[in-house]
Every structure is written in C-alpha cells, then in structure tokens.
C-alpha cells in the first residue's frame, strides 16, 4: 500500500530527473505510509533523496544514496531493532559501497546488491527471537528486497510487468503457531505533524511523545 501510493505520483512525472523522482517518492511514501515498515520505507526514500547530489547518479552516487537511506531510517526510529528492515537496508548499503568500484555494468551491480539484500533478509530469522520461533523472515525486510528485485527486473528487461489480481478462489491449509512475543503495544498509531514553528527541538519532542 505504501508503494502503491507513490506509484501514481511517479507515473505522472516520468520525465523528471532521478533527483526529482526521489523527492516525489520521499513525499508520497510518507503520506501513504502504512504500518511500521511503511513509515521506515518512507524514511529510506527520504534518505535516498538526501544522498543524491545531482540529476544523474553513477554507481558511487547510488551507493551514497543507499547509505544515506539507511542512516536516515535508523535516526528516524526511536529504538532501532536489528533483524528488521533496518538491518536489510544497512547491509544492502554496505554491499552497494563495496561493489560500486568493481567496474561492473548496471545489471551486474544491482545483481550484487539484490543478492546481498537476500542474504541479509535470510539472517533476520535468526536475529529476532520472535521470527526464529515462527520460522519466518522479517516482513518489512522482505518488502524492501521485493522493491530491489523489481528495480533489477526493470534494468534487465526495460519493461514493467503488471501483475493481475487473481479472481480464482484457492483453499489453503495452515498450521496455527502459538508464538510467545513480549509486545507491549500491539497496534500501530500513525499521524502527521505540520510544523509551523521554525526552531523546534526535535529530540525533546520525540522524548515527550515516546512516553505515549
């Protein structure tokens, strides 16, 4: 849902530069964010926009944008937790920086990035006890990997593959799992704050709302 909110705005601005598109993505994903991972994704997009320095981006520029994305997302979260989308973003950024100077072409470069992202995602199952108990990887991290895989697919084919929704009923069976998780707040509340004051102590504000 978060990405869907951004797709419409990007589609209307296809002739814009990479920098312009990243700015549109940052704004659209923030306003359309759904859930914790959606909000973090919007901060990743914000970081990408901050990390890009011009209308075009070479591999080192892309790597810098990835790093800026991870750094921005970590700073935006009051209590960053490893084994989540944050870990996948950080380790993907580290991989991008590593491969940026290897003389690869665009497809090879992004293949390395996607492979690294998938490896990072696989490890999330063994970092968070809740994920290990359930036998699953982090959902937000998986979403980020899917976005990167989509970018790679477009680089390879130059085409966007539209996925049609299935109207065929499908019966599935699943075994319920009793997962014991120490979750204090079992719901997600989101709100946007329009800041009119010019000089605001952001850290003081965060410490105040953190109580609630």
Task: Describe the residue ranges of each PLM region.
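N-terminal loops that bind phosphate or other acidic moieties
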Residues: 1-212
């Amino acid at each position: 849902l978060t990405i869907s909110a951004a797709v419409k705005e990007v589609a209307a601005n296809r002739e814009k530069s990479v920098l312009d598109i990243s700015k549109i993505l940052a704004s659209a994903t923030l306003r359309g964010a759904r859930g914790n991972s959606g909000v973090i994704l919007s901060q990743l997009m914000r970081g990408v926009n901050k990390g890009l320095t011009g209308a075009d981006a070479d591999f080192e520029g892309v790597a810098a944008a990835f790093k800026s994305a991870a750094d921005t997302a970590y700073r935006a979260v009051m209590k960053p937790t490893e084994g989540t989308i944050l870990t996948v973003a950080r380790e993907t950024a580290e991989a991008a920086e590593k491969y940026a100077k290897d003389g690869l072409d665009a497809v090879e470069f992004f293949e390395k990035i996607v492979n690294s992202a998938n490896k990072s995602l696989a490890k999330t199952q063994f970092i968070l006890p809740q994920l290990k108990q359930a036998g699953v990887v982090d959902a937000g991290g998986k979403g980020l990997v899917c976005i990167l895989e989509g970018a790679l697919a477009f680089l390879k084919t130059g085409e966007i593959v539209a996925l049609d929704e299935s109207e065929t009923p499908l019966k599935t069976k699943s075994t319920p799992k009793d997962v014991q998780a120490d979750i204090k707040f079992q719901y997600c509340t989101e709100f946007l704050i329009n800041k009119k004051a010019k000089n605001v102590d952001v850290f003081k504000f965060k410490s105040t709302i953190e109580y609630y």
